[in-house]
């Protein structure tokens, strides 16, 4: 969150369930509360800080067992024209590069653009841009707004949906192929 402070954002708040990380961030000038992001936390943030123009979740969605609940909490604090930005390991890279370490790293979920797009639509939100990156062996950064928000959906979303279809990421044999590759 330091980058937002450096860009001049004034009302910055971190949320992290790890006490040590929250304390260290606060000590370094980024006020951070030590708790999970859920509806109760969101209501407290809203009451004390108001709506957020930007909400980020870097490598958080992979560890959450209630994705809809966390997304509801994010929606509670996000301004109607706000932007939600998340980073997750990219399922296509996990499968094609056989990133078994990613799987053993306590991740509960692995994300494709197709699945995230569908999930977000069910939450009255829309994926408007996606970037691929090298983090964790392969990651995506998704940019999200409320459905019908002020930003256009970028070509990057359609391009990665097309890539996933071409690579047959939606077919069970693709995942089985990873399993078979690990067995050999």
What do the predicted segments below correspond to?
Residues 68-85:
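A short glycine-rich, Lys/Arg-flanked "PGG" loop and its adjoining helix->strand segment in the class I
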Residues 1-9:
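Conserved SAM-binding loop of SAM-dependent methyltransferases across substrates and taxa
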Residues 53-56:
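A conserved beta-strand element that flanks and buttresses the S-adenosyl-L-methionine
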Residues 18-20:
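Conserved SAM/SAH-binding beta-strand->alpha-helix loop
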Residues 28-44:
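Conserved SAM-binding strand-loop segment of SAM-dependent methyltransferases
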Residues 136-183:
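Flexible, glycine-/basic-rich loop-and-beta segments that form/coincide
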Residues 84-109, 113-120:
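Short, glycine-/aromatic-enriched active-site segment of Class I SAM-dependent methyltransferases
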Residues 10-16, 34:
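Conserved SAM-binding motif I beta-strand of class I
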């Amino acid at each position: 969150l330091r980058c937002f402070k450096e860009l001049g954002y004034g009302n910055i708040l971190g949320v992290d369930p790890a006490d040590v990380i929250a304390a260290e961030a606060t000590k370094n000038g980024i006020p951070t509360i030590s708790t999970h992001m859920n509806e109760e936390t969101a209501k407290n943030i809203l009451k004390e800080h108001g709506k957020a123009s930007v909400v980020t979740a870097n490598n958080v969605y992979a560890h959450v067992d209630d994705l809809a609940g966390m997304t509801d909490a994010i929606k509670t604090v996000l301004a109607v024209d706000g932007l939600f930005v998340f980073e997750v390991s990219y399922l296509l890279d996990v499968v094609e590069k056989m990133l078994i370490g990613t799987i053993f790293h306590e991740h509960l979920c692995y994300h494709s653009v197709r699945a995230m797009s569908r999930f977000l639509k069910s939450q009255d939100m829309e994926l408007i841009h996606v970037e691929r990156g090298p983090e964790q062996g392969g990651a995506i950064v998704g940019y999200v707004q409320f459905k019908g928000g002020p930003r256009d959906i970028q070509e990057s979303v359609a391009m990665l949906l097309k890539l996933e279809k071409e690579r047959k990421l939606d077919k069970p044999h693709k995942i089985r192929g990873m399993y078979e590759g690990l067995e050999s």
